[in-house]
Amino acid sequence: MSSPLHYVLDGIHCEPHFFTVPLDHQQPDDEETITLFGRTLCRKDRLDDELPWLLYLQGGPGFGAPRPSANGGWIKRALQEFRVLLLDQRGTGHSTPIHAELLAHLNPRQQADYLSHFRADSIVRDAELIREQLSPDHPWSLLGQSFGGFCSLTYLSLFPDSLHEVYLTGGVAPIGRSADEVYRATYQRVADKNRAFFARFPHAQAIANRLATHLQRHDVRLPNGQRLTVEQLQQQGLDLGASGAFEELYYLLEDAFIGEKLNPAFLYQVQAMQPFNTNPVFAILHELIYCEGAASHWAAERVRGEFPALAWAQGKDFAFTGEMIFPWMFEQFRELIPLKEAAHLLAEKADWGPLYDPVQLARNKVPVACAVYAEDMYVEFDYSRETLKGLSNSRAWITNEYEHNGLRVDGEQILDRLIRLNRDC
């Protein structure tokens, strides 16, 4: 661990750190390592206090930890009693980030083998090595948002004695459910969001239909040179499960045309809203977070056939898709094209190890408090409740007050409520 120069932000002492960990934790003596990045936060007036640690695990997979710009939200509440570690999970942010150029020297099989080491089990083993450096004599606590909550359940399965408290927000994993089952449930949620969106903004349907027809008939290029297709337009529904997303999407559509031509500003906005070129791990590993001893076989693509309303054709009303990954993306997105063969190999890989230990979770003694969002588009509510039935010492706050991004919207209040829930106060 190195300790570069710290800085102070809004009364917070911030210090970046780098950690070296094995690429493959099953082969720790292998010489191949990766570098992880984390940022520790502590209130400046409490630097000399003996504070417990809280590790924040970001959602995704494929996104780095937040870059704080103020003492607010959940960070403000956490810093009242914790030192916080914002960890860029392996392959994201500043932690040996995955991109096509990094893997260009490898053949597709080698690329797939390399990428297979970036799931939750490896992320958790990274975190445990870091805990042994930062808090060797004491367990630490976790705050897991979305996929970060999935990682937290993996942590509870592998290293329960290393944890003091766990807080999950929109992140109770569908343990025991296949990728097919997950997408079957989330497609229904996406269909519900489509109905709600077009009911709220009826005029948007005609604009979306016109856009789809225009993209089908014309070779439209984004500012980066990538062709914009109907399928990519459908993916603008990725954020429909977040508060404020309906308005953002409507305003995007509203400004799409200038007369008969597309507005250049619209094209820049669409490009900025696509995370797959900047965060390729999101596309490569998304289905694999649901795989234990089975291949995904492009589950979202196969299950989509059960929802014909989501398959656009001329003369049909347009509908958006959600958080689904499709094989065609590796033929259209510029940063995914070089990883196409590796992605197909990973989709056919069946010998994935376990991510969770249901027996250990059933006898769990670590207090776990969960915010479960009843209308979550990304993490199926019914499957979360199933998992909670098998997770001892857990308490759930079930609410429809927030969407999946509740922690970002009202993090101070949500974390405070979960802390009180865990401690019976």
Swiss-Prot record:
Entry keywords, A to Z: Aminopeptidase, Cytoplasm, Hydrolase, Protease
GO biological process, one term: proteolysis
Similarity section: Belongs to the peptidase S33 family.
Entry annotation: catalytic residues: S146, D351, H404
The enzyme's E.C. designation: 3.4.11.5
Stretches assigned to the AB hydrolase-1 domain: 52-315
Subunit details: Homotetramer.
Family annotation (Pfam families): Abhydrolase_1
Subcellular location: Cytoplasm
InterPro entries: AB_hydrolase_1, AB_hydrolase_fold, Peptidase_S33, Serine_prot/Carboxylest_S33
Organism placement in taxonomy: Bacteria, Pseudomonadati, Pseudomonadota, Gammaproteobacteria, Aeromonadales
Primary localisation category: cytoplasm
Gene that produces this protein: pip
MF annotations from Gene Ontology: aminopeptidase activity
Catalyzed reactions per annotation: Release of N-terminal proline from a peptide
Biological role stated in the UniProt entry: Higher activity toward long peptides. Acts on hydroxyproline beta-naphthylamide with almost as high an activity as on proline beta-naphthylamide.
One GO CC term, this protein: cytoplasm
Name of the protein in question: Proline iminopeptidase
